Amino acid sequence: MSTSARDRLIVGLDLPTVTEAEKIVSTLGEEVLFYKIGYQLAFAGGLDFARDLAASGKQVFLDMKLLDIDNTVAKGVENIVKMGVSMLTLHAYPKAMKSAVEAARGSNLCLLGVTVLTSMDEQDVIDAGYEYDPHSLVLRRAEQARAAGMGGIVCSAEEAAAVRKIIGGDMALVTPGIRPAGAEKGDQKRVMTPADALRAGSSHLVVGRPIVAAPDPLAASRAILAEMESALSR
């Protein structure tokens, strides 16, 4: 796994239009190599943009959080492989993960199991009908993802150290909810700074609003990369 901060920082293009996303990518230039595209942008022309971004040499994390019957998940993954993106999320349900792994076999697509959304706290998990607290549910799903042959896990930085012990050193551990010191949490409930997340065992950090909504996105990305480089060099 690369030790470069630029290979580990994923900028979340949580924007309403492709035009705005293109502007951010242009502004960040060669400073940022990896971008995340989720529902908001995907359903506004972002899937074609994802193909173009991947074709241009950038890495793309397609955050679709797939979950459906086995065959539907498999067919979806087969077509996503053709897009040339680097990462894809699906909810960490055993049958869905096994189908996705088989569909992606032989490709370079890294499949990520989503454990528990970083916007959820213990009450949210209870309200959703689970008997586990968020931490226990994350660990259970991490083990299931490892057993299914997934390429990595998505979890909050709070669980990163415990998850890393379960999945070992080879799987990716992607952490959203990253906020530089002093930044607003927004709708995230389980957050951590870039340096602390890396020290906890995260391999990739997803940063959205602190960069794309910053007065100077390029300066914001450079500050976060510097913090990451400092943490990685220790």
Curated annotation (Swiss-Prot):
InterPro entries documented for this protein: Aldolase_TIM, OMPdecase, OMPdecase_AS, OMPdecase_bac, OMPdeCOase_dom, RibuloseP-bd_barrel
Protein name: Orotidine 5'-phosphate decarboxylase
Cross-referenced Gene3D superfamilies: Aldolase class I
Function in brief: Catalyzes the decarboxylation of orotidine 5'-monophosphate (OMP) to uridine 5'-monophosphate (UMP).
Keyword Lyase: yes
Binding-site positions, substrate: 14, 36, 63-72, 118, 179, 188, 208-209
Keywords for this protein: Decarboxylase, Lyase, Pyrimidine biosynthesis
Record GO biological process: 'de novo' pyrimidine nucleobase biosynthetic process; 'de novo' UMP biosynthetic process
UniProt similarity note: Belongs to the OMP decarboxylase family. Type 1 subfamily.
Reaction equation(s) it catalyzes: orotidine 5'-phosphate + H(+) = UMP + CO2
Assembly with partners or alone: Homodimer.
This enzyme's EC code(s): 4.1.1.23
Active site (record annotation): K65 (proton donor)
Cellular component annotations (GO), alphabetically ordered: cytosol
GO MF: orotidine-5'-phosphate decarboxylase activity
Pathway assignment: Pyrimidine metabolism; UMP biosynthesis via de novo pathway; UMP from orotate: step 2/2
PROSITE patterns noted in UniProt: OMPDECASE
